[in-house]
A protein has these predicted regions:
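Segments of small-molecule ligand-sensing domains
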Residues: 314-327, 338-414
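Extracellular/periplasmic periplasmic-binding protein-like sensory domains
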Residues: 253-334, 418-419
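Venus flytrap/periplasmic-binding-protein-like
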Residues: 83, 130-132, 136-141, 218, ...
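Periplasmic-binding protein-like
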Residues: 97-112, 129-134, 181-186, 233-244, ...
Length: 446
C-alpha cells in the first residue's frame, strides 16, 4: 500500500517537473539563476532566409551555452516574436518581449534598420542595449550621444567607404575615380538610404557622379530601374536590397541588360548564399562585403554542430546551413551578447548571477574581442577583431570583400577599413552632435 502511494507521489512529482520545465522561470530554475533574452525574429516575409539563419544561430548558441553550464552558471532563457521585418510589428514585439516572468530584457536586436529607428528612442529610458550588428542608425556609433546604442562591430558608412575604396583599387587609384559614374540602387526605406550621407560626400570629394535610384518595397519589380541603369551606363552599381527575392531579381535584371556582375557590389544583407542561388548563373561574379565570413570549419561552429545538432536541439530546419553567411552573422551577434554578459558579471561583482540592463550596458561597452579571445571562443577569422569604448560604439569598422563563383563565395580581401577612418568618424560625430543639439541632449563625457 505504502509503495503504491510513493509511486503515485513520484509520478505526480515527475509530471510537475516536466510541466514546470516548459516555462521560463525568473532568477532561479531549480537552483540555477537565469538571464532572459528576446528574439525579435523575421522568419516570415521577404527576409525569411536572413531571419531563419540569423536568429536560428542565436538560439543555437544560447542552447550551446546552456549545454555547457551557462554563463558562469547562469542559464539563458529566451522568447521569440515575429516582426516580419516590419517596423510597426517590431515595436509590438519589443513591447511583448520586454518582460517575461518578472525579468526584463537587457538587449534588443531587430536586424532591421527601419525597426531600429522605430525603437531607438526608448533604449535609454528602458535601460536596454540596442545591438545594431552592422545595421541601423549609423551615428549611434557615437556613445557620447547614444550611450545605449551600439553598432558593434561595423556600420553602413564604414561599409560604403570600404566598397568605394575597393572600386578605386580596381580602377587604379582614387585619382582614377574622377568622372566615373556610380548608381546606388536601393530599396526605398531608411535602410536603403542609410549609406547616402557618407556616399554623397566621398563621391563629391572624388569627382564621382552619384545617381540614386530607389525601388519600392518589397523590391521584386525592378524593370524600370534597370532600364534607367542601361541608359545611364554607370561604371559601378552599389546594391542595397532587402530579402533574397529582391536581391536575386537584381542579378537577373543585370544579366538581362548585360550589365557586368563584377561591377556590382552587394550590401551585407544581400551577401549570402540564399541571395545568390535563386539567380543561378546570373549571380556569378557579383561582389559583396561581409562582416562575418561563411565557413563551417570554425571550431565553435563544429562544436555547435556536434553538441546542439547532435542532440537534436538545432534550430535550423536544414542543418546544411550551418556555417552559412547569415547563420555565422547571427552567431557573431550572440557571442557579443554573452561576452557582454560575462564582462558585466565581472565588472559588477555578479559572477554566477543575472545582470541588470545598466550592468549589461557596461559589459557590452567593455567588449574587447582580440584575436586571442576570438580564438578562445572558436571564431578567429570569422569576424574582425575589435573593441568598444565609451565614445566609439562601432569598433572595427572593417569588412571583407567576397565574390560569388556560382557555388560559394571566394574571399577577395582581408579585413579592410575605410580609406580614411577618421573622415568617417568625423561624419558620425557631426551627425550625432546635430541630433543632440536638436533634441537638447548633453553628450556624455568620456
Amino acid at each position: 500500500m505504502i509503495n503504491k502511494i510513493v509511486k503515485k507521489l513520484l509520478s505526480a512529482l515527475t509530471m510537475m517537473v516536466a510541466i514546470l520545465s516548459t516555462f521560463a522561470i525568473p532568477q532561479t530554475v531549480f537552483g540555477a539563476e537565469t538571464q532572459y533574452f528576446p528574439v525579435a525574429s523575421s522568419r516570415v516575409g521577404p527576409s525569411s532566409a536572413m531571419g531563419t539563419g540569423y536568429y536560428g544561430a542565436q538560439i543555437d548558441y544560447m542552447n550551446y551555452v546552456n549545454m555547457n553550464g551557462g554563463v558562469n552558471g547562469v542559464m539563458l532563457t529566451w522568447q521569440e516574436c515575429e516582426t516580419e521585418y516590419n517596423a510597426v510589428k517590431t515595436v509590438e514585439c519589443y513591447q511583448r518581449l520586454f518582460e517575461k516572468d518578472g525579468q526584463r530584457i537587457v538587449v534588443f536586436d531587430t536586424l532591421a534598420t527601419p525597426g531600429a529607428y522605430a525603437v531607438i528612442n526608448r533604449m535609454a529610458k528602458d535601460n536596454v542595449v540596442l545591438a545594431q550588428y552592422g545595421y541601423g542608425r549609423t551615428d549611434g556609433a557615437d556613445g557620447r550621444v547614444w550611450p545605449w546604442v551600439f553598432n558593434a562591430a561595423s556600420h553602413y558608412w564604414s561599409q560604403i567607404a570600404v566598397k568605394l575604396k575597393f572600386m578605386a583599387q580596381i580602377e587604379g587609384g582614387v585619382d582614377k575615380m574622377k568622372g566615373k559614374k556610380i548608381v546606388h540602387l536601393h530599396i526605398d526605406s531608411a535602410y536603403g538610404r542609410e549609406p547616402l550621407p557618407a556616399m554623397r560626400k566621398i563621391c563629391s570629394d572624388w569627382g564621382v557622379k552619384l545617381i540614386e535610384i530607389s525601388i519600392p518595397p518589397p523590391g521584386l519589380e525592378q524593370q524600370s530601374q534597370w532600364l534607367q541603369i542601361r541608359r545611364e551606363k554607370p561604371d559601378w552599381v552599389t546594391f542595397w536590397g532587402a530579402g533574397s527575392g529582391m536581391n536575386s531579381t537584381a542579378m537577373t535584371n543585370a544579366a538581362r541588360i548585360n550589365f557586368p556582375r563584377d561591377r556590382m557590389m552587394y550590401v551585407t544583407f544581400g551577401a549570402a548564399e540564399e541571395d545568390m542561388y535563386p539567380a543561378g548563373n546570373a549571380a556569378i561574379g557579383t561582389y559583396a562585403v561581409a562582416n562575418a565570413l561563411p565557413g563551417a570549419d570554425f571550431p565553435l561552429v563544429k562544436k555547435i554542430k556536434e553538441q546542439v545538432y547532435g542532440a537534436g536541439k538545432g534550430n535550423l530546419a536544414d542543418p546544411k546551413r550551418l556555417g552559412s553567411v547569415y547563420w555565422n552573422r547571427g552567431l557573431g551577434a550572440a557571442v557579443m551578447w554573452i561576452e557582454g554578459m560575462r564582462n558585466a558579471q565581472k565588472m559588477h561583482n555578479k559572477v554566477g548571477k543575472a545582470v541588470t540592463g545598466a550592468e549589461f550596458r557596461d559589459g557590452y561597452e567593455a567588449l574587447n574581442m582580440t584575436e586571442a579571445r576570438l580564438g578562445e571562443i572558436g571564431i578567429k577569422g570569422m569576424v574582425a577583431p575589435f573593441s568598444i569604448s565609451c565614445a566609439n560604439h562601432e569598433g572595427a569598422g572593417k569588412f571583407a570583400v567576397m565574390q560569388w563563383n556560382g557555388e560559394s563565395f571566394d574571399q577577395i580581401t582581408g579585413w579592410e577599413a575605410p580609406g580614411d577612418p577618421a573622415f568617417i568618424r568625423g561624419l558620425v560625430e557631426s551627425s550625432a552632435a546635430k541630433f543632440a543639439k536638436e533634441n537638447n541632449i548633453t553628450p556624455k563625457k568620456c
